[in-house]
Amino acid sequence: AAMPLASLIDPSAHKTPIITPFTLSYNGAAITVSNNVWNEMKKNVAMEHNLPKHPISASSLKPVIAQYKQQQKLFKLGMTFPTGTHNYMLRYWLAAGGIHPGTYDPAHNNMSGNIGSDVDLTVIPPPEMISTMVEGVTSGYSVGEPWNQKAVKKGFGVSVITSDAIWENGADKVFGLTQKFAQQNPTTTLKLVKALIRASHWLDENNYANRKEAT
């Protein structure tokens, strides 16, 4: 959802004005950690009725990161793109728990985002999130579905917080068009948005029964 804005403010972007006339999905993302990390992390998680109390704060991750530092190991987490919402939500969650996610310094051409960080946030393509975590390249990740549910279902990791607990009704996927196209093709743009609205209503009909046919 942040990509249209990034296309204008990112120093490395081509400065193409993009409009977003329709939001395709809200929330739908989560933060997942490996089983090894969770086994250590859960020692610091508040419990309720013998179950972890959600949402889980990143503060419970601090002792785990401290152990990595003592062993001179880098604690690495994956995210989809520097200007994507998954990166922003991961950074917010970490910072709220007292973990420095790192900063950017465009004035000195340092866009790593890891200045002063306690963790290393690295870009991983969504389909590779699970495999890189299982292989030990990362210790967890922030991504949209289905990559969190798949990791949980296959027993590879634990989802510690969903995106709606960080930003309720936060836009995830949006329909974007270049401003130039929309201005030159107003009728086509209107018809595209109408089609998306009708499709959305169809997907929600009969208690979401049509979604199976759509997939």
What are the roles of these predicted feature ranges?
Residues 1-122, 134-135, 139-149, 156-169:
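Short, glycine-/small- and polar/acidic-enriched structural segments
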Residues 128-215:
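Pocket-lining segment of extracytoplasmic ligand-binding domains
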